[in-house]
Amino acid sequence: EYHMIMEGKKLSQSTCYQYGVTLKYLLSYVRIKHKVADYDISIIDAAFVNEFFAYLQGYLRQDNMKRCDINGALKHMERFKKVMEMAFNNEWINRNPVKALKAHKEKTDINELDEEAVKRLSTVILPPNLGIVRDLLIFAVYTGVSYEDMTRLTQKNIVIGIDKSLWLSYYRQKTDIH
């Protein structure tokens, strides 16, 4: 909570949401493994960190809970590490045990759409609701606009550019760059 009060103003809404998800997983782990609702931050050690990391990937999880792949678990651990670093800097703990975690991201293959696939997609006849989704995807492919930014676009974002043609003008949600 302290981290969100101090850092929340600097973080995007989606990043704040992700910190909340990490907290939810952490509290769930503490309830399941340690049978308590709250846990003293000063007694978090390497074993706690390693078991929480394993928990994120499926250890001790109920069947209906989503398991993280290693890269997703590492993102949660990165947020946990930042919070623990803040606790260390405020002298609430003597060391940050998350720093000792040794894990590496797995390389993921990114499948790119080639021009032929985009053309095929654009000619498929779909029901109206799926047609809109398809059109938005193709728009994103050609403009490079992220999904997050597309959800915030309105007519006001279409402006006359310096070449007198229609341009898209908006602030990027993630970086606040125009």
List PLM regions with ranges.
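Short, aromatic/basic-rich helix-turn unit that serves as a nucleic-acid recognition element
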Residues: E1-L23
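Residues marking the start of alpha-helices
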Residues: E7, A37-D40, N64, D109
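Basic, Lys/Arg- and aromatic-enriched nucleic-acid-binding interface segment
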Residues: K66-I70, L74-E78, N89, I93-Y147, ...
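N-terminal DNA-binding recognition helix of tyrosine site-specific recombinases/integrases
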Residues: S14, V21-I32, Y39, A47, ...
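Conserved helix-loop functional segments at active or binding sites
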Residues: I32, Y55-G58, Q62, N89, ...
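Short, solvent-exposed loop/turn segments that connect beta-strands within catalytic domains
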Residues: K35, Q62-R67, N129, G161-L166
